[in-house]
């Protein structure tokens, strides 16, 4: 099994961001047989400047029998902004939804926290086994829920998008992310490959998911200011939300 650790070089982040990164990798290690996923050499660790501040992006990616790419990104912009981004892209031969989570920290406070397992079926619903387990989690027990963006129709009814207030809510969010991850990994390793016809439907669904995610204007604006539009398109389509072949 591949041994992993994150964060590393050049990344000094909000403690909650570091805690979540370590939690994600711990669950992956517990359930999945991780193998390297090779990014282009210039995209594993990236530095730039944004409004006078140093911007650092560090990417780690893995693959498994069930997932074509597990992506964990950490980013910092000077002392102002800390970001964690994670998506688990299934192989099109497995009928799995897509797990994703993000944390955004600004000046020591977490301003946004989101986690979801997004359906990939034609009826835009999660498999019943997911519904049964997710509905038991305390996702309604947060003081400051946030509104999903217009392109957020890709998310499930169990999407949790909040601004956590205080240590208790922050730790509750971490616990919920771990539960989502464990449910998803358990279901993944129990799945069997589907027919070629079903693979075509999964391929279409992943294309749609990636296309919608690339509409996140906030992400694009930050990257374009630091690296320009051409590099931003390259990064969005190669690292963040690359569609399967």
From Swiss-Prot:
The kind of enzyme this is, by top-level EC class, is oxidoreductase
The EC designation for this entry is 1.3.7.5
UniProt keyword annotations, A-Z? Oxidoreductase
Q: Fetch the InterPro entries from UniProt.
A: Ferredoxin-dep_bilin_Rdtase, Ferredoxin_bilin_OxRdtase
Q: Does the keyword Oxidoreductase apply?
A: yes
Catalysed reactions listed for this entry: (2R,3Z)-phycocyanobilin + 4 oxidized [2Fe-2S]-[ferredoxin] = biliverdin IXalpha + 4 reduced [2Fe-2S]-[ferredoxin] + 4 H(+)
**GO MF assignments:** cobalt ion binding; phycocyanobilin:ferredoxin oxidoreductase activity
Single GO biological process annotation from the record: phytochromobilin biosynthetic process
Source organism, top-level taxon? Bacteria
Q: Which family, according to UniProt?
A: Belongs to the HY2 family.
Please describe what this protein does.
Answer: Catalyzes the four-electron reduction of biliverdin IX-alpha (2-electron reduction at both the A and D rings); the reaction proceeds via an isolatable 2-electron intermediate, 181,182-dihydrobiliverdin.
Query: What is the name of the protein in this document?
Result: Phycocyanobilin:ferredoxin oxidoreductase
